[in-house]
C-alpha cells in the first residue's frame, strides 16, 4: 500500500473538531507495510485508571480519543496484566510480569522497594535500537525525584508524582505543556540530526476519581469532591448506573477478596456511594476526569500536528488499569478480574496503516514492550536481540492483519500480588523512617492468578502464604477461591460456584491457567514476595 502521510495530516486537522466516529469491524484485509527509509518516532501516551469503553457517553467531547480511533487501530480486547499503578506500569515498561519485576505493590508504601535498575526497560530497549528515549509525567516505579536515566529515560522533570488528591486536575496540563515544549526543542533537534525519538507522556487523570467521596467518612489517604471548575460541571444522564451497583460483596460465589478489598479501600479513600444517585454522581465525576485529561491529550495531538510529526511518528495510547465505576458495588481498582478493572483502552496510530480499524483479538500489556522494539528495528534478528527475555507478542502482527489471532488461543494472564488491598481491617503501625506501614491478615485469599480468553475468564484467589499450582479439582477448591465467567455477560453468575458446578469447564480452564503461567512465569512459588522490605511475613498481623 502507498504511504498516506498527506491524507493523514489533512484528516487530522479536520479531526480537531469533535465528531462521532463509527468504527469498522474486524474483517479488514491484511496489508503489507512499505519499507521505510528512516525509523519512525514513537510517542507513548498513557492515562491512569481508565477503563475501556466501547462507546463514549453521548454528552462527552472526547476529541482526542475520537481522533485517535479514527486515525488508528483500536484494540478492543486489550487487558492489563496486573494492578495497580506500580505493578501494571512495571509490566508495561519492561515486558515482564510482576513476578520478575518484583513490583508487587505501590512504591509510595514503605514495604515496596524501587524496581531494580538492572531490569531492562523500554527506555533501555529504545536506546539500544538507536532512539533518544525521554519521559514525561507519572512514573511510580521508583521513588526517584529528579532523574530516570538509570532506567533508560532522559529529560524527566515532573518528580515523584503518583496521583494524590486532585493531582490530575493540577498536573496534567503541566505534563502536556512540558511534552509539547520537549517536542519543539529536543524532539525536533533529534530528528534534524537524524535520530528518532521515543517519548513517553504519562497523564494522571482519570486517577483523581480514587479520592472522590461525598460522605463524612473520609479516607486516611485523603478524600475530595469535584473541583470547582467548568470541566467538572457536566452530567451524563444517557449513561445508566450499572445494574449490579448494589450487588452484595458477600454474595454466595464471590471470593472473600472482594469484600476485603472494598471495605479496606473505603478506609483509605472514603466511604463508597450507597445509593444509585450517589453512584451516578461518582460516575459523572469520573467521566469529567476523562474529559479533563482528554483536553490535555488533544492539546498534545494538536502540537504534534503543528510540528508536522504525524508523517513520521507512531502514537500508542493506553491506560495502566481500569476503574470499577460501581460495577458489582465496587469502586477503584485491585484484585479482581471484572471487565471494568482489567479491560483497558489501546489504540495505535501508525502512518503506514489506514485508520478507523479495529482488532477483536485478545492482547495484553505484556505485549507492549515487544511491539515497541519491533516498531523501532529494521529486522527480526536485531529485534530479537534487543528484546531477549521479553515474552509478549508483537502487536505489529495485528497492525498488518487485524484478524491475526494474537492471544486468542492461550489467553492473557493477570497476576496480582499486592498486600495493601487484601484486608478489610488492616493494622497501621509506625515505621522507623517516620512513615506508616500496613499489617494485614496474610491468610486471606487476596492473591490472584487469572486468565482471559475469547470465551471465558477464570481466576484463582489464594493466600500469599499458600502459593499452589492445582492440577485437580479437589486441590483447586481446597486451596483457592475460584471464579469462572462467560465473556460478554454481566459477570454476576460465577459458573465455578459451588464446587461441582461445570467441572469439565473448570478443569479445562484451570489447566489453561497453569499452561500460561508455566510459559510466561515459569515456577510460580511466591519467591518474588521476598522482595518486600524485610520479607512479606513482617507485614502480617
Task: Please give the residue ranges for each predicted region.
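Bacterial N-terminal signal peptides that target proteins for export
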Residues: 2-12
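C-terminal motif of bacterial Sec signal peptides marking the signal peptidase cleavage site
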Residues: 23-25
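Active-site-proximal N-terminal segment of extracellular/periplasmic enzymes that hydrolyze or transfer
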Residues: 32-76, 82, 496-501
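Active-site-proximal cap/lid insertion segments
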Residues: 37, 52-53, 58, 189-191, ...
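Short, solvent-exposed turn/loop segments enriched in Gly/Ser/Thr/Pro and often Arg
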Residues: 54-61, 72-96, 135-145, 202-207, ...
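Catalytic-site neighborhoods of secreted/periplasmic enzymes
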Residues: 91-199, 204-225
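C-terminal, low-complexity/hydrophilic appendages and adjacent surface loops
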Residues: 141, 217, 339-340, 416-499
